[in-house]
Each structure stands twice: as structure tokens, then as C-alpha cells.
Amino acid sequence: MSKSKSSRSTDIIDIYAKPDIKLKVLEPRQDRELRVELEGRSINHAIVNAVRRSVMLYVPIYGFHRSNIHIELNKFKNMYNFDLMYNIFETLPIFDVPNFMDLIDPDVYLPVELSKNLFGRFVQEQYTEQSDQEDKLVDATKKLFKIELTLNYKNNTADDKYISSHDCVIKIDGKTSDGYLKRRPICLFVLKPSEEISLRAEANLGIAKNFAAYEATTNAIHEEKNPNKYVITYKTLEQLNKYVILNKACTIIYKKLENLQDYLLRTYTEDRDPTEQIDIELYGEDHTLGTILENVLQQCEYVEKAGYCMPHLLIDKILVSYKLYDDSEIGPIKVLNDCITYLIKLYKQLADLVPKK
């Protein structure tokens, strides 16, 4: 350990110790709301913000993409155009999908491209038709839910008919779901007398980072009580249980970190000189990973300075840079690897603390 580091900084963390975390479920103020308090010496703004971002951006959800909405042309007799119909059904939620296991074994349950988006590819990839076809063949073997919505309606009355979610039939793995009927109807559009519509939509798995139709929650926020105590608040959109969402958000972060650790071990087979500044480019990543890596490196006893940047706002690529003290006892790649191990332990512990309800 560098003496200069210990004498100048009061926020050093021991990356070799067990993370100090407590999780407390608070009383919700609204229906479907989850409020959890995270507290402990290992909790700070970066750790909590990564959870918040993961809740909002990364939890996989089934939704209707317009490419999977099929309108029957000879029964589409109304005043609307196809684009409007696509927009309506893309934003229609799907309720009560028993999708609890997809992160346990991503190789079995997640499409290839989605798995890469979630858990990191870290290197720049080049799209080819061959790779796309290979991914489709692999995806065909995945254990995904088959979710299908149908709507067939002709207004045979003399009055306008408000078409709602109650007029839709949705099936999950061939079984009719009562997710729409047991909730208040969601108004979709109006059919005038003698107008009709017939369509079928198939759901696929996606994440909100790529398309907002796959949001699992309303806007997630965190509130600072003190530097080591925060409250995270969000409301589930009812496809997934509110506790399942939090567990998945933490699981995604630690699995992403595990993949990053594997990538570093493959890429850096030998350590570097402790006096050397290390710059690592990670493609496909954004502020979620960048902030927690920066934070843990800045609080590590061996690191003199550390930071990250996202060079382009519209391109997912981060550059992580750090330098050890010259008298450091271990190499920079080993330090980074140990810091990542600490973060993996932290988020695993956090996931285990989420109630199983």
C-alpha cells in the first residue's frame, strides 16, 4: 500500500474484504411501487446509480416489435394506417409473464444478440450475413416463451366502438392469459360502424436500452439520505414482479462484470509495469459499467488516479484509464481484476438480499 495514498484519502475501500451492504424494503406509497433502502460502507452513488440504470435499461422484457405485427389486409377496413397500428401495439404492455429464469442460464434462455448487449462483447464486431444467419439458427434452439396476441373485430352496430385490450386475446405458450381481462381496459382506438380489423402480433424479448417498448418499469429514481445510504424507487409495469426486476438488475451487472473479467484474462496474459498508465477500450458499454469501474479504482489503495470517458454520446464505447502508485506492490492488470472481483461479490450479495416474493 502506498503511504501517500493512505495519508491523503479517507474514502479507501478494502477490495479484499466482504462488502458491507444492507437492504431494507420500505412501505410503498403507490400500487405496484417498490422502495428499497440500500445502506452500508460499500454503498455509494456509483453503486446505486448502476442498479437504477440496470432496472431502467437492461431487464429483458417481452414486447411487440412492429416487424412481428401482422395485419390482415382484406380485413383492415378503417380510417387508420399501418404505422399508427404498429405504434399502438408496440406500446401495449404484456402482463404476468412467468419469466424468472432467463438470467440463470443465458445460453439457454436468451437470444444471442440480446445476450451480447446485456453481458458485454467489449470488442468491436463486424456484421455479416453469415453471422446473422448463424445467430438465427442458435436462437431457434433457445427456450423462449411463445406469446401471441390476436385481434379480430367488426363493428356491426350503429355506434362507434372503442376497441380496448379486453377485445384482444393473448396466449402464452398456447394457454390463454387473463392478464388483460383482470385489469382495467386499455383503450386502443375507435372503429366506426361497419369498420373492422384483424391482426396478429408475436412478442419477442428485448431491452429498453435498444427500444423503449421493452421497459420493465416506470422511471426509476434514487434519493440520497447520506453518502452511504440511498433509497431506490420505481413502479413495475406488471410483466414482472417488482422484486424480480431488482434481482435481475443486480444479476445483469455481476454477470457483465464476470464476462469483463474473462475478457481481461484472455486479452492480458501478462501484467504490465506498475508505473505504466493503463488505457482499456470497451466496446458496447456505457456509463453503467464505466462509473462503477472508475469509482472502485479511485477508491483502491494502489491507484493514484483513475477515470473513464465515453468519447461519443451515440456510440457505446468507454475508455477506462488508470495509473498505480509507482511503489505499488502488484501490477495494474491484477489490481483491475481484483477490483472487478470485489464488484462481483458486491452485486451478488445485493441480489441475494432482494426478497423472494
Curated annotation (Swiss-Prot):
<dbReference type="InterPro" id="IPR036643">
    <property type="entry name" value="RNApol_insert_sf"/>
</dbReference>
<keyword id="KW-0240">DNA-directed RNA polymerase</keyword>
<keyword id="KW-0808">Transferase</keyword>
<dbReference type="Pfam" id="PF13656">
    <property type="entry name" value="RNA_pol_L_2"/>
</dbReference>
<dbReference type="GO" id="GO:0003899">
    <property type="term" value="F:DNA-directed RNA polymerase activity"/>
</dbReference>
<comment type="similarity">
    <text>Belongs to the archaeal Rpo11/eukaryotic RPB11/RPC19 RNA polymerase subunit family.</text>
</comment>
<dbReference type="GO" id="GO:0044423">
    <property type="term" value="C:virion component"/>
</dbReference>
<dbReference type="GO" id="GO:0006351">
    <property type="term" value="P:DNA-templated transcription"/>
</dbReference>
<dbReference type="GO" id="GO:0000428">
    <property type="term" value="C:DNA-directed RNA polymerase complex"/>
</dbReference>
<dbReference type="InterPro" id="IPR036603">
    <property type="entry name" value="RBP11-like"/>
</dbReference>
<dbReference type="GO" id="GO:0046983">
    <property type="term" value="F:protein dimerization activity"/>
</dbReference>
<keyword id="KW-0548">Nucleotidyltransferase</keyword>
<keyword id="KW-0946">Virion</keyword>
<keyword id="KW-0804">Transcription</keyword>
<dbReference type="InterPro" id="IPR009025">
    <property type="entry name" value="RBP11-like_dimer"/>
</dbReference>
<protein>
    <recommendedName>
        <fullName>Putative DNA directed RNA polymerase subunit R470</fullName>
        <ecNumber>2.7.7.6</ecNumber>
    </recommendedName>
</protein>
